[in-house]
Design a protein with these regions (language model features):
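N-terminal binding-site loop/beta-alpha segment at the start of enzyme catalytic domains
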Residues: 1-81
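A short, structured active-site edge motif that brings together acidic residues
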Residues: 80-94, 122-125
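Beta/alpha (TIM)-barrel catalytic core signal, keyed to glycine-rich beta->alpha loops juxtaposed to Asp/Glu
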Residues: 127-303, 311-314
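Conserved, mostly hydrophobic/aromatic
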Residues: 16, 39, 54, 67, ...
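Short, acidic/polar
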Residues: 31-45, 98-114, 157-165
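Acidic (Asp/Glu)-rich catalytic clusters
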Residues: 68-81, 111-115, 166-169, 192-196
């Protein structure tokens, strides 16, 4: 497993996303929520293979509670424990006191379900909650940290949000979507602002909901706007002598400042496959990055917006 040092932490490049452990998520053979035994097997396999960060949230079904019971079991067995990232929101606004109470109330609920007394990374799930009242959110997070309830603060965002605002927030980390097709925040300087801020940058949606694994032949014809970009991606991963997954992940991990990629897994075997994938990643050269930029600069916005897709598979 590859590791990255950030903010005094030695973090695995692979962070395990756990939304699948708390609710039925996605489509396919393993889309159903796993049994608790299967969930524990996923978590055990990840940590035993070197993954040292779990990503969850208070709206991921009972993911936090499942993790809490697993943590209790691991502690009793004297086994190593991972860092925990969880998220709260949306929040109740109206006054400072109302907002502060809701942040604290949600955080305490998270810690109770996780069976912990202190959280490693406390993340605001909705950028809009921060943007609505930046000064209040900064003060509230600082106040709660002074009480010893968490170590690091974070904000989750989408690519449509202002990364410059996040970079100036004073928070320790952010979580953002990024993939090989989406160059918007790279070209406008948003990614560089995050890197220059020294924040930990956690990434998600690396495979763009699996689009990188498809070919034009297995996509719905109504997604023909993707075809030229997929064909070029296929040409490039063959030229670079990488698998589609390895190129997609290598691209993200080659970006300045990126700390981790968050990936969910449906089975323990998939955890092992993803760990091997991280070992297959490479630092892309400037020439390779330039070829990717030339291929996907000015991409049709429908390609990087799954909300505009039709059913992908024939």
């Amino acid at each position: 497993m590859k590791y990255v040092q950030a903010k005094g932490l030695d973090l695995s490049a692979f962070a395990l996303g756990t939304v699948q452990l708390g609710l039925t998520y996605g489509l396919g053979e393993h889309s159903e929520k796993p049994t608790e035994e299967a969930a524990f097997a996923i978590l055990d396999r990840a940590v035993d293979l070197g993954v040292n960060t779990l990503d969850t949230a208070n709206n991921y079904g009972d993911s936090e509670a499942v993790i809490g019971r697993w943590l209790t079991k691991r502690k009793a067995e004297g086994k190593k424990l991972p860092y925990i990232v969880t998220k709260v929101g949306p929040l109740k606004h109206g006054s400072y006191d109302i907002l502060r109470y809701d942040v604290l109330y949600q955080l305490e609920g998270c810690m109770k379900r996780l069976c912990i007394d202190k959280l490693d990374i406390f993340m605001l799930h909705n950028y809009e909650d921060y943007a609505q009242d930046r000064d209040a959110m900064q003060k509230i997070f600082a106040d709660i940290k002074s009480q010893g309830l968490y170590d690091y603060s974070a904000i989750s965002a989408y690519s449509r949000h202002d990364y410059g605002v996040i970079a100036e927030s004073g928070f320790d980390a952010t979580q953002i979507p990024i993939n090989v097709f989406d160059w918007g925040q790279i070209e406008n300087g948003g990614m560089q602002k995050l890197a220059d801020s020294g924040m930990m940058i956690f990434t998600r949606s690396v495979f763009l909901q699996g689009l990188v694994f498809h070919t034009p032949e297995d996509l719905d014809p109504r997604m023909d706007f993707c075809f030229p970009y997929l064909n070029r991606f296929i040409e490039l991963y063959k030229e670079f002598e990488l698998s589609p997954a390895a190129l997609a992940l290598s691209f993200v991990l080659s970006l300045p400042g990126v700390t981790q990629a968050v990936m969910g897994c449906d089975t323990a075997d998939q955890v092992e496959s993803n760990c091997k994938l991280f070992d297959q990643t490479v630092k892309l050269t400037d020439e390779q990055m330039n070829k990717l930029h030339d291929a996907f600069h000015g991409i049709d916005p429908r390609v990087i917006n799954p909300g505009m897709w039709f059913n992908r598979m024939k």
